[in-house]
């Protein structure tokens, strides 16, 4: 085989690895879990980092804060800087980082709607407000096909199911492509196949959990919710993609790729 043909074959067979970051909702993130995921990112140096949204909570400008003392707390700057620091630490050793829009990050725009004269200010557009371009991160305002046949979404684009993986799978059926998402705070994968005989296709719905500390979520009654902490690791060769879900324990520890992070 000619060397040029061998090189092309090797290029086609190169494994690309993704680290998928679930909902952080800074400042309500699980600090130990996030530190351990950063250790994983630095050790493995993934080719790409995918962020499913809700990286920052924006709790002081939520509709729930209106008319309460929370609306007067001046914490957005600190929350933003902490979010940027965490995202940088998670992606600094990767060639690319993609971030998808989400309902919590939409809170900035929804707040600007109350003062329409400010909407056109470029520095108040969410990607600029967060400085993503300066950090080499790409922001997507709509669902993004990051791999042939696979869409990155937040997960609020359709109806939400209480069963892990089904929210993503319903989006996959709607779009005709497999879906990777967050939003539900659940960790799971579900699949659906359709066709006749040897002519069929399989669709997958993958939900990647969350990286929140539920003790900080004061709105949860008794701190109870059908949530699971986790992240995902993806490996691709050519058009083939294999997802691996990584459950994270309540103390923030987990095992991934043969190593314990604790």
Question: Model segments located where?
Answer:
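Structural motif
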Residues: 18-20, 50-52, 152-154, 180-181
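Acidic carboxylate-rich catalytic motifs and surrounding loops in phosphoryl-/glycosyl-chemistry enzymes
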Residues: 98-104, 139-142, 244-249
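Conserved beta-sheet core of the metallophosphoesterase superfamily
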Residues: 149-246, 252
């Amino acid at each position: 085989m000619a060397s040029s043909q061998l090189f092309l074959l090797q290029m086609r067979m190169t494994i690309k690895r993704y680290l998928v970051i679930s909902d952080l909702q800074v400042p309500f993130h699980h600090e130990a879990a996030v530190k351990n995921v950063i250790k994983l990112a630095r050790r493995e140096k993934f080719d790409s980092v995918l962020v499913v949204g809700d990286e920052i909570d924006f709790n002081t400008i939520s509709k729930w804060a209106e008319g309460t003392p929370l609306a007067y707390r001046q914490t957005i700057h600190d929350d933003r800087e902490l979010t940027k620091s965490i995202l940088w630490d998670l992606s600094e050793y990767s060639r690319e980082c993609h971030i998808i829009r989400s309902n919590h990050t939409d809170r900035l725009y929804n707040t600007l709607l109350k003062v329409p004269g400010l909407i056109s200010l470029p520095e108040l557009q969410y990607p600029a407000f967060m400085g993503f371009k300066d950090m080499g991160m790409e922001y997507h305002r709509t669902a993004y096909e990051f791999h042939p046949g696979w869409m990155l979404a937040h997960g609020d684009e359709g109806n939400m199911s209480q069963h892990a993986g089904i929210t993503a799978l319903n989006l996959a059926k709607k779009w005709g492509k497999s879906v990777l998402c967050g939003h539900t705070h659940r960790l799971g994968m579900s699949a659906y196949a359709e066709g006749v005989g040897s002519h069929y296709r399989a669709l997958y719905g993958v939900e990647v959990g969350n990286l929140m500390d539920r003790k900080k979520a004061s709105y949860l009654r008794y701190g109870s919710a059908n949530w699971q902490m986790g992240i995902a690791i993806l490996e691709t060769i050519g058009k083939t993609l294999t997802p691996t879900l990584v459950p994270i324990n309540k103390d923030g520890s987990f095992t991934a790729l043969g190593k314990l992070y604790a």
